[in-house]
Amino acid sequence: MATGTDQVVGLGLVALSLIIFTYYTAWVILLPFIDSQHVIHKYFLPRAYAIAIPLAAGHLLLLFVGIFITYVMLKNQNDTKKTQ
């Protein structure tokens, strides 16, 4: 069973994800339909970043997954050599 701390951390992560999803959805889907002179545009980055930020995040995710897999494989290989 999850402890109180786990539940609070989980709730925080869900809330953060919801905020990011809402912001990104408004930025990418709704903002192009609003007049470019409207005051709401100052709260969002330029549209070029709408592609660049997720692309960079995806690359970082793949990089960290690759590093983790490489680390685990090398560690298992070293453990196998020690037992022989």
Swiss-Prot record:
Its main location: endoplasmic reticulum. Pathway: Protein modification; protein glycosylation. GO terms for cellular component: dolichol-phosphate-mannose synthase complex; glycosylphosphatidylinositol-N-acetylglucosaminyltransferase (GPI-GnT) complex. The keyword Cytoplasm does not apply. Keywords: Endoplasmic reticulum, Membrane, Transmembrane, Transmembrane helix. GO terms for molecular function: enzyme regulator activity. InterPro entries: DPM2 (IPR009914). It is a multi-pass membrane protein. It is found in: Endoplasmic reticulum membrane. The chain crosses the membrane at residues 11-31, 49-69. GO terms for biological process: dolichol phosphate mannose biosynthetic process; GPI anchor biosynthetic process; protein glycosylation. Belongs to the DPM2 family. PANTHER family: DOLICHOL PHOSPHATE-MANNOSE BIOSYNTHESIS REGULATORY PROTEIN. Regulates the biosynthesis of dolichol phosphate-mannose. Regulatory subunit of the dolichol-phosphate mannose (DPM) synthase complex; essential for the ER localization and stable expression of DPM1. Part of the glycosylphosphatidylinositol-N-acetylglucosaminyltransferase (GPI-GnT) complex that catalyzes the transfer of N-acetylglucosamine from UDP-N-acetylglucosamine to phosphatidylinositol and participates in the first step of GPI biosynthesis. May act by regulating the GPI-GNT complex. Component of the dolichol-phosphate mannose (DPM) synthase complex composed of DPM1, DPM2 and DPM3; in the complex interacts directly with DPM3. Component of the glycosylphosphatidylinositol-N-acetylglucosaminyltransferase (GPI-GnT) complex composed at least by PIGA, PIGC, PIGH, PIGP, PIGQ, PIGY and DPM2. Interacts with PIGA, PIGC and PIGQ. This is Dolichol phosphate-mannose biosynthesis regulatory protein. The lineage of its organism: Eukaryota, Metazoa, Chordata, Craniata, Vertebrata. The gene is DPM2.
